[in-house]
Amino acid sequence: MLAPALTHVVKGIVDHPDDVRVVAKSSPRGEVLEVRVNPEDLGRVIGRSGRTAKALRTLVTALADGRRVRVDVVDD
């Protein structure tokens, strides 16, 4: 449920929504959501001083309802 919600939000931010990929992985410390976007959109997703990325992490934490979830913006 978290990956589709995060995908929807990120697609609304970027200029190339077809390139947005969110992959959910399990780790011993909880779930990890890896966000991959077009390299041209990386700055939009991270935001000035990381503000947008922090807002995305806050949103996912609220939706996680107490579960441990980490959001990583991956730079390929």
Swiss-Prot record:
It comes from the Bacteria. Its main location: cytoplasm. Residues 30-76 form the KH domain. InterPro entries: KH_dom-like_a/b, KH_sf_prok-type, KhpA. CDD domains: KH-II_YlqC-like. Gene3D superfamilies: 3.30.300.20. It is found in: Cytoplasm. Keywords: Cytoplasm, RNA-binding. Pfam families: KH_KhpA-B. One of its GO terms (cellular component) is cytoplasm. GO terms for molecular function: RNA binding. The keyword Metal-binding does not apply. The keyword S-adenosyl-L-methionine does not apply. Belongs to the KhpA RNA-binding protein family. A probable RNA-binding protein. This is RNA-binding protein KhpA. It comes from Leifsonia xyli subsp. xyli (strain CTCB07). The lineage of its organism: Bacteria, Bacillati, Actinomycetota, Actinomycetes, Micrococcales.
